[in-house]
Amino acid sequence: MVYFLGIGGIGMSALARYFKANGYEVAGYDRTQSPLTQRLETEGISVHYVDDPAMIPENIDFCVLTPAIPADSKELNYLRDKNVKIVKRAEVLGMLSRQHNSIAIGGTHGKTTTTALVTHILMTAGKKLSAFIGGIARNIDSNVVIGDANDECVVMEADEFDHSFLQLSPYVSVVTSIDADHLDIYGDYQHVVDSFNEFVNKTSDDGLVVYHADLPINTDKKHITYGLENADVIAENICVNQGETCFNIKIAVDDCWEDNNLRYLRDLRELKMSLYGNHNVQNALAAVIVSTYLGVNEADIRRGLATFKGVQRRFDIRVKNTRHIYIDDYAHHPEEIKAALSAARKVFSDKELTVVFQPHLFTRTRDFMDGFAESLSLADRVILLDIYPARELPIDGVTSAALLDKITSKNKMLCSKNELLDIIKGIDPELIMTVGAGDIDRFVPQIEKMLAQ
């Protein structure tokens, strides 16, 4: 029996399903019921929602713990008193990363989409693999691909929170971005950079480090950079045509990496995908490099890009009709919001943009108040919900009202959850985005239903 404390998280639920598929009995606790936990229950995994040691099954082999579980958890302390083996989620992923050639994809932003895209291209090419994705990939309607002992590789999202990705031993490591985030853990930006450098330097000596050319990565490992300029692999001629993003890839260095599959990297023209935004073009560059290194040919790369449907809550177009366009996005950092709103502005340039934002964490809102205000001001209308606290207590002076004061959009307002649907109905928006990492996603089905009519 494998027991999960915090089984409803996107990463924990993937591991729970992996162990269940590999013949283990699985059970777990989470604070609240969600679509993820409901899905686990339909798959035969027992989940309860009360922090009560009496509800823990007997005969547990080990417990998998998420960092989100507080130190005063009754169940956690009960298991410790009983000397049950407790391992962090990252330790389990670390173990799996050592059993197969692992592709670990990290970055403060972009890692989930890139992980899902690499997984999809490899599956398109017929590769045998397992994958652990930090979101629901639309092509497979899942956050996990369950392989077997014959897997050629395992693709995993590498989470920087709580230094989790330092447990991994990748064959290929990818870093999509490094911004100041999780400062409650790291303290400052330099410590974030140091941790990412420690991560890439855990890459095996015969492997590859792939990273965005703008990043302060320092490694002696074999590496390759990508970006829109000043990189080894560059995206050019980016445009949106008939609902698709089109771009070319140019190899900008003479070194053809003759000792490995990177020698097959070449200039590619007229690549197409359904994702929008320059940030997603750059995510695609990383995916193309990784896939080429793992032996995927050009035809399968083109087909994989063209058929990739994206990830839920990542520029997720939920409604597109003659009256309304509704996009849902997980963005919860100023740079992510800037990328998402800029993409919406570019693709739907003739529409007035309304954004509903739920700030996530008091510390993050405090640390990036000015950045949030600047990014949100890209919208014509801003509607702010209260800050979603997650694991935190309130901080004096850190409120949605304080953020609203700094936003320069002429049309802006505060809104309670109870008012949200009526306000959206009254606005009748032509282009609206819901943005945030809290529980704003609970409103998505209702907003979708209202605007789809």
Q: At which residue positions do the language-model features occur?
A:
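Conserved N-terminal Rossmann-fold NAD(P)-binding element of oxidoreductases
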Residues: V2-I7, V435
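Nucleotide phosphate-binding/pyrophosphate-handling subdomain across enzymes
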Residues: G11, L15-Y18, N22, D255-R381
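Phosphate-binding loop of NTP-binding sites
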Residues: Y18-Y24, E41, A54-E58, P67-K222, ...
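N-terminal beta-loop-helix "entrance" segment that forms/cooperates
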Residues: A21, Y29-H48, R138-D141, D396
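Short internal beta-strands
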Residues: Y24-R31, V209-A213, T354-F357, D380-P389
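Beta-strand->loop->alpha-helix junctions that form or flank phosphate-binding loops
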Residues: Y29-D30, H48-D51, V87-E91, F132-G134, ...
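Short acidic low-complexity segments
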Residues: S46-N59, S416-I424
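C-terminal helical cap/extension that packs against the catalytic core
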Residues: A373-E430
